[in-house]
């Protein structure tokens, strides 16, 4: 039922796209992304490149460098190729592997790994469900109650990589959360990137700062994802993005300078994030 509801939401997005003609010169193996490419340029930019869309609202005297959108700026063709990595097929099985409360209980895999962490109710499970929208048999449980995820959940994406959903920190976090997460982050040798989710409506909280300090202390390469961008006006969202971007530029060492604004409801930014994950895990070779 959960997968059905997700596909219904995706369908509403694609119904809008199908009313427009095809985007010339671009080929995608993903039917869903091919439909996205039918959008007019302005709408396509908002869905695929949300930072570009936000940049249109910057005043001319804004300080340069606050939105570092060109660091990872793939072509639509590359984004289309990445879609196939996240599409479940007979040859590309996407599946839930197992859950673990301790690292020594985690599956031992050689393929690259990425993990998602964030405070309770930041929208982590909703985002992971959006990433796996083309793998409807993969069940990612979403709860209205914060702190639903209590264990490390491992999802295998074909032969490409493993995605790890970490418990949320803060409200109703597991008692052994710190030990669980610290041990994983320090000792997981095949961990390629940590994705830290921040609520774009709330901004960076004290709890987020603790997670940031942990990543910095362990010298981990990490990326900041701004969730729930559909819940704010453009003006407020732009203000939040600029503030968080300045924080990243001036207060961090290991954070990737480019932010990834995301909406799991409208799928804005989801396709770009898929491409980034596929790129850093070597899945686009």
UniProtKB/Swiss-Prot annotation:
Molecular functions per Gene Ontology: GTP binding; metal ion binding
GO cellular component term, pick one: mitochondrion
One Pfam family here: MMR_HSR1
Cofactor field: Mg(2+)
Entry keyword annotation includes Cell cycle: no
UniProt-listed Gene3D superfamilies: P-loop containing nucleotide triphosphate hydrolases (3.40.50.300)
Coiled coil residues, start to end: none
CDD domains, A to Z: YihA_EngB
Alphabetized UniProt keyword annotations: GTP-binding, Magnesium, Metal-binding, Nucleotide-binding
InterPro entries, per database record: EngB_GTPase, G_ENGB_dom, GTP-bd, GTP-bd_ribosome_bio_YsxC, P-loop_NTPase
All residue ranges annotated as the EngB-type G domain in the record: 110-283
Binding site for GTP: 118-125, 147-151, 165-168, 227-230, 262-264
Residues bound to Mg(2+): 125, 149
Family that this chain belongs to: Belongs to the TRAFAC class TrmE-Era-EngA-EngB-Septin-like GTPase superfamily. EngB GTPase family.
NCBIfam families: GTPase_YsxC
HAMAP family registered for this protein in UniProt: GTPase_EngB
Designated name of the protein: GTP-binding protein 8
Native species: Rattus norvegicus (Rat)
Organism ancestry: Eukaryota, Metazoa, Chordata, Craniata, Vertebrata
């Amino acid at each position: 039922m959960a997968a059905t509801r997700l596909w219904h939401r995706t369908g509403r997005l694609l119904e809008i796209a199908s009313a427009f003609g095809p985007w010339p010169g671009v080929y995608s193996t993903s039917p869903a992304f091919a439909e996205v490419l039918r959008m007019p340029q302005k709408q396509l930019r908002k869905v695929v490149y949300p930072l570009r869309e936000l940049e249109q609202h910057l005043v001319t005297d804004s300080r340069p460098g606050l939105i570092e959108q060109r660091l990872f700026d793939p072509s639509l063709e590359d984004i289309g190729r990445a879609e196939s990595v996240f599409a479940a097929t007979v040859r590309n099985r996407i599946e839930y592997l197992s859950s673990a409360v301790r690292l020594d209980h985690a599956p031992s895999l050689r393929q690259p790994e990425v993990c998602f962490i964030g405070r309770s109710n930041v929208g982590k499970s909703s985002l992971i469900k959006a990433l796996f929208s083309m793998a409807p048999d993969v069940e990612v449980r979403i709860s209205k109650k914060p702190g639903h995820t209590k264990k490390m959940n491992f999802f295998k994406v074909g032969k490409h990589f493993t995605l790890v959903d970490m418990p949320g920190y803060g409200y109703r976090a597991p008692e052994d959360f710190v030990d669980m997460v610290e041990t994983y982050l320090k000792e997981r040798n095949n961990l390629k990137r940590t994705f830290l989710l921040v609520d774009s409506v709330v901004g960076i909280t004290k709890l987020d700062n603790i997670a940031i300090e942990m990543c910095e202390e362990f010298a981990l390469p990490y990326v900041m994802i701004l969730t729930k961008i559909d819940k704010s006006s453009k003006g407020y969202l732009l203000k939040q993005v600029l503030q968080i971007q300045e924080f990243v530029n001036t207060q961090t060492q290991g954070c990737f300078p480019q932010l990834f604004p995301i909406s799991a409801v409208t799928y804005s930014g989801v396709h770009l994030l898929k491409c980034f994950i596929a790129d850093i895990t070597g899945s686009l070779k």
